[in-house]
Amino acid sequence: MDSLYKWFSTIYQGKDTCIDQDVFLSTEIQSIEIQPEEKPSEEKQPEEKSSEEKPKLQPVSAINSEKTQKPISSVALPNEDFNKLLYNFPSLSRRPQPKTTTERPQPKTTMDDKQVVVTFITERGRSCELSSERSRYRSPERSRYRSPERSRYRSPERSRYRSPERSRYRSPERSRYRSPERSHYRSPDRSHYRSHNKSTERSHYRSTERSRYRSPERSHYRSPEISRKRSRDESREKSLGRSRKMSRDESREKSLNESHKRSRDESQEKSYEPRPAKKLREKSPDEHQEKHQEKSPEKQVEITKPLEDYIALPKENVPDVFEIEKSQSTRYFSEKARIYFKNTHDGSIVWYKDDAIHRDGDLPAVIESDGTVKYYRDGKIHREGDKPAIIIPGKGKSWYLDGKLHRDGDEPAYVSNDGTLKWYRHGLLHRENDNPAIINLDGSMVWYVDGKLHRGGDLPAIIKPGICFKWYVNGHVHRDNDLPAIINIFKMPKLCNMYRIGDMVWYQHGQRHRSGGKPAIVTFRGVLFYFENGRRIYESPNGKEYYNMTANKLMMDFPYLLE
């Protein structure tokens, strides 16, 4: 800057030689702006010395004022080019020399000095020169999405799914399925990661392998000891030691169990002692016969007695003649009857004879708790005299002969309370004279012959009024004369009491078939499907006219379809 200062001063002095100095100062130096700068007293001494050493610069009054002796920051001169140079280099004042110390004070920058400071930072010095107050979005350390330390999805330390320490599925320490120590399916004896010498009496609450939720005492599904796939030998050994029902003190349990057993045994002995049945069995058979002959005409059990008076007896302990004590009353059974009964778990009563359900005298052999009555003969449901063998209150009646549904005289073998009638012959649905074997309450009828759907005379075997008609021959859907074997009926949506023929299907011996290149399925929407021997060939969507023609012809030939 000193050399630049000298250069401008010499140029200015050369211009003063041609122009009067007094005139120039009065007219040209009106725009001089003097800005004082506060500097310490120590810095003034070197300035005075420098002015004494340079006597040639004294006549330049435009730059250093004689009255103030203060530096001038800017000077406006008549030459325009020179003013431009002054604008590009605004500070013409001589700056003080730097101190000799190593710490050099940085120059103060003001808004008047229109300077642009450009600093070049290398890659090595970037981390040192970066400002600590930088934007939170530009800093890779503070960015929420770019920072590897704060990012939820990219950080390997905080990521929930990628962290091997926190991941539930990948961590070998926390994984439920991979950990050999916590695995639900791996037995501790079969696992090759665990040693067999580990103590079995480890703490249940301090061990990391038996946490609060996976403890074999608290968890029913995760414990390897209680696993369903464990072996039977291991389950028996370990379940006994870790059963929920066992208390902490085994000695108390044993003592309680022994006391309960003793009390039960004593109570049983006491209860069995006063029973008169044992006393009667100890007596001789002659005494039994004498007692029976004396009391049989008066106290012998009759069939008309209410069933609540009887009790259950095991079949093995039934003697020829015995007595039973119940509610301070005695009942006797004679040897001639040879029929006994028992109560089952549901409260029903059954009569037996020679190890088979049987009861004579046209009486029910089974009486259930809901009131159902069944008649048996030699172990088979049977009742003669055209009477029902099974009577279910509120449901219906059934007729049986020798264990099969049967009724003679063209009468239904099953009559339901809702109006359903079914005809059977020797256990098979059957009815002769072209009559339906099943008649339901809704009016639908079904024809059977020897247990098979069948009806001759080109008549439908299944009739559901207003729904469909089906033709069967020997149990197969079939109809001859190129007529549909299934005709569906649908109700007109706008007309309440009007019906129309819907879809039509042609069958031959149980398979969809129609010869002559005609469709085997004709829908009411006009879609045609072609079949041969049950195999579908193709379909045609343009068949509305064909449907109308076929439906109208069927209504004319078979008027009962829409009745």
From Swiss-Prot:
Comp. bias intervals (Basic and acidic residues): 36-56, 101-115, 123-276, 282-303
Compositional bias (Polar residues): 61-72
Region annotation Disordered: where it falls in the sequence: 30-303
Family: Belongs to the mimivirus L41 family.
Protein name: Uncharacterized protein L116
